[in-house]
Amino acid sequence: MKFKLLTINPGSTSTKIAVFENEKEILSETLRHSSKELEAYKNIYEQFEFRKDTILKVLKDKNFNIQNIDAVVGRGGLLKPIVGGTYKVNEKMLKDLKAGVQGEHASNLGGIIANSIAEAFGVSAYIVDPVVVDEMEDIARFSGIPELPRKSIFHALNQKAVAKRYAKESERDYEDLNIIVAHMGGGVSVGAHKNGKIIDVNNALDGEGAFSPERSGNLPSGDLVRLCFSGKYTEDEILKKITGKGGFVAYHGTNNALDVQNAALEGDYDAKMTYNAMGYQVAKDIGSAAAVLDGKVDCIILTGGIAYNKLMTDFIAKKVSFIAPITIYPGEDEMLALAEGTLRVLSGQEEAKKYK
């Protein structure tokens, strides 16, 4: 049976939309929003009608008959911690997305816009594996300071999608596998997947774990505290150093990993050291995840935009291939991942979860 799905992925300055017929993409557009357009709105939620109307106008301009859709799926936002899966949008979810219970982010609009369009055409709206997916074991939450428990905020959508892709290609069930997934993009997350649950992962949103093109990664605690109280920086400036101006940005003034790689290949010693240091830290986190899984690892997956860079994947593979075979799925196809999650529900493979 064929299903037509509208997928919606709101970002800070753009909204990506795509239409799928099962897993085949038949329409894709990135709708850019100028800062001038967005300045008219006091907060993220106020952009809702503007973004929705823009989506409907583009679909009309493309002569797509939206009445033919079977479901609408939006990118999941900063909700309360939930287990992974596909969730049907309900009133409780809409309330929490509007309130920004874990912070304001453009992705909070995904479920809201999806629900509004779905209601107008008499179909259901869903979200799939938002960044707040939390399946961590209790032992993984300890940090060493009770007031600072470790949190699970990471690239859940792509982590789950590539792990399930590997399972499908291996003709095995995701729930029967132990997989380590290293997502490397603007941020880095390394997740230990055990029998269908991500039982330990770094908080990529706050820059925990390996450093990345724009995030600092783990820092020397004492030195960080002294920096905070040096009088040189405000709280916002310190937070920016950790997420936004850390990593490659701090060392080389760019968040483009390819620029750093090319400089390294051209003989720039500092660029080579920084580039390798990121790979070193990712490999170290993969080793830690292997310990979490008691050394029983079926596969290590390298994914995200930086997984296109052979210099990086080769460096990491050399260090961790003794643990398990390496599979590389470069990039992240978020729109397809949203569609696949919804298809699993519509086809009866999975049951939609209820947000509470």
Curated annotation (Swiss-Prot):
Localization terms from the record: Cytoplasm
PROSITE patterns in the record: ACETATE_KINASE_1 (PS01075), ACETATE_KINASE_2 (PS01076)
Species annotation: Clostridium acetobutylicum (strain ATCC 824 / DSM 792 / JCM 1419 / IAM 19013 / LMG 5710 / NBRC 13948 / NRRL B-527 / VKM B-1787 / 2291 / W)
Pfam families attached to this UniProt entry: Acetate_kinase (PF00871)
Gene3D superfamilies: 3.30.420.40
Protein name, UniProt field: Butyrate kinase 2
This protein's record includes keyword Lipoprotein: no
Any one Gene Ontology molecular-function term assigned to this protein's record: ATP binding
Matching SUPFAM superfamilies: Actin-like ATPase domain
Keywords, ordered alphabetically: ATP-binding, Cytoplasm, Kinase, Nucleotide-binding, Transferase
Main location: cytoplasm
Quaternary data: Homodimer.
EC number annotated for this UniProt entry: 2.7.2.7
Cellular component, GO annotation: cytoplasm
Family the entry assigns: Belongs to the acetokinase family.
Annotated metabolic or biological route of this protein: Lipid metabolism; butanoate metabolism
Reaction catalysed by this enzyme: butanoate + ATP = butanoyl phosphate + ADP
EC category name: transferase
